Structures are given as structure tokens and as C-alpha cells.
Amino acid sequence: MSWQAYVDEHLMCEIEGHHLTSAAIVGHDGAVWAQSTAFPQFKTEEMTNIMKDFDEPGFLAPTGLFLGPTKYMVIQGEPGAVIRGKKGSGGITVKKTGQAMVVGIYDEPMTPGQCNMVVERLGDYLLEQGL
């Protein structure tokens, strides 16, 4: 299965009639492996900072998580494994795997829990595959 198929079929899938607004799989180096059409353009340093928060949990808390034009307030995640952010009625979930980061962005009517489930389920599968 191509990386794009993982994004299209597993991240952008419908859940209870809703789906993520955008999603991507990005290497630890910030290189995009695959993304949905609406995924925001981002700076390499934004991905570098996300990776740094995985290595040093709490790194993003004082400044927030920036991705493209959006700043998310960092909320409780799983140190070293999952970063979650919130902005208004939407938010972001980032799951770290051995070689990549699975990123999902949502807005109402999708819930944070639905976003977490979609992103973390694919991330866990990739971890099981050694990716």
C-alpha cells in the first residue's frame, strides 16, 4: 500500500459521518511522505519543534504547536508518543512512529476523541510493522 493510500483510506476515512479536515504522514526529518490536499504548508522548523517535543516532553507547552498558519495550544498527550493540540472547536493529533509522524487535523463536528482514534490507530499499526 502506498503512503498516499494510508492517508486517503485510513486517515481521511469517514467516522460516524465525519472525517478529518486534513492529514499527513511526515518523516522525522520533516519530509512529507503523503498528505491530503488540504494539509497546510508548514516550515521545516515546525516539524523540528514537534520532534523536539517528543524527545523533550513539554518543549512546546510554553509557545504552542505551530503548523502552517495555525497555532495550537498543547494539551495532555502521551509523552514521547502522542502530542495533542487544540484551537477553538478544532485541533491536531500527532503520533510518533519509528520513522514517521502521523498527523491529523480536525474541526467540529468531528470530536477530539475521533481524531485521536484515527491517528493513533494508524500510528500503532505502523509501529507494529516496524515503521
UniProtKB/Swiss-Prot annotation:
Alphabetical UniProt keywords: Actin-binding, Allergen, Cytoplasm, Cytoskeleton, Disulfide bond, Phosphoprotein
GO MF annotations in UniProt: actin monomer binding; proline-rich region binding
Motif Involved in PIP2 interaction mapped to chain: 81-97
CDD domains in alphabetical order: PROF
GO cellular component: cell cortex; cytoskeleton
Cellular location(s): Cytoplasm, Cytoskeleton
Keyword Cytoplasm: yes
InterPro entries: PFN, PFN_euk, PFN_sf, Profilin_CS
Physiological role: Binds to actin and affects the structure of the cytoskeleton. At high concentrations, profilin prevents the polymerization of actin, whereas it enhances it at low concentrations.
Family affiliation: Belongs to the profilin family.
Assembly description: Occurs in many kinds of cells as a complex with monomeric actin in a 1:1 ratio.
Listed name of the protein: Profilin-7
Species of provenance: Zea mays (Maize)
